[in-house]
UniProtKB/Swiss-Prot annotation:
Upper classification of the organism: Bacteria, Pseudomonadati, Pseudomonadota, Acidithiobacillia, Acidithiobacillales
Gene name in the database record: pgk
Residues that, per the record, bind ATP: 203, 325, 351-354
Species annotation: Acidithiobacillus ferrooxidans (strain ATCC 23270 / DSM 14882 / CIP 104768 / NCIMB 8455) (Ferrobacillus ferrooxidans (strain ATCC 23270))
GO molecular function: ADP binding; ATP binding; phosphoglycerate kinase activity
Protein name: Phosphoglycerate kinase
Any GO BP: glycolytic process
Assembly description: Monomer.
EC number: 2.7.2.3
Amino acid sequence: MNVLRMMDVPLKGKRVLIREDLNVPMNDAGAITDDTRIRASLPTIRAALASGARVMLMSHLGRPKEGVFDEKASLAPVAAHLSQLLGRDVPLVRDWLDAGKDRLAQLQDGDVVVLENVRFNTGESKDDEALSKKMAALCDVFVMDAFGTAHRAQASTHGVGKFAPVACAGPLLVNELDALGKALQNPRRPLVAIVAGSKVSTKLTILKSLADKVDQLVVGGGIANTFILAAGHSVGKSLCEADLVPDAQAIIAAARAKGGDVPLPSDVVVAKAFSETAPARTCRVDDIAADDMVLDIGPDTAKTLGDILRKAGTIVWNGPVGVFEFDAFAGGTEAIARAVAESSAFSIAGGGDTIAAINKFHIEDKVSYISTGGGAFLEFLEGKTLPAVAMLEERARGTHT
């Protein structure tokens, strides 16, 4: 990845516009319920302030209607929380492209402000050129640090970087890309990927891409049911996609053709209903009844997969292998989590459900790298080019798109 890095750019006295991903969950009362993304941005913010920059932070929050102020999507709670974490006043600036510009002109070296939700600006999602130029005019240096939105070509993530005097990657973005590159571009072998979730259709391109790269492709959740069906077993009334059986068979064949494999469950945990209170039964995959729903992998499968993970050199994890929110069907995901934690492999995990599972089983400090990106993490796994990263690479080469 050939990009200019923030740490290599002189920032003292410069107006520095940093795009972070501060899109945090909030409850109905407007209180932040998980500040992981805010905390992840702190090293970048502190480094810019320590350099004597005049720091302006940009982010989106939620999906408000463009061009309309919506109190529920205001970054005011984020600015207040940043004030607490940084131990200093972090004002929120509204209408920052127009009337609020006067406030930005008053910034001194070492000051920091939060700019109100970028999605209140008409043209943000369409990467509008005029809007991008107005944003770029606010700064001497643009820092793209939001890996979680790097897969979106929008004005605040992509367009602004094309027109800013200097465009560079922030430490968080650099760390994310370095970790993903280490896992996929030159991995320590064996490389094991865990791809789970409810539907094959949503992760088909990822499965196909990884089948060519990995030594073992572990499938779980509803995705595994389609693969079990592809192997000739019944899955009862489980969530599965029968029309994608040929795709599943092709993925298995592709993995085996290059010496890899897709290890399928030998036993599963089933129930008659998708419910926390439904009685759970463990059975062989040959014994799934017509009215059964597969809701987790069984203990034999968990042991087999655990052994594979403990011997891995690199692990990429996206998705829980069962309905881990229900304790009766959490055993498989817990076993996977424990195996990842105990493995000496370089491990990277991403996706909301995966991170929730990591937190539930308290292995945060045992995973080498936990990605802050959901969609961006998946698109990187697919082998897609992330627009914001492509823009930074083009700027580093001295070209514009």
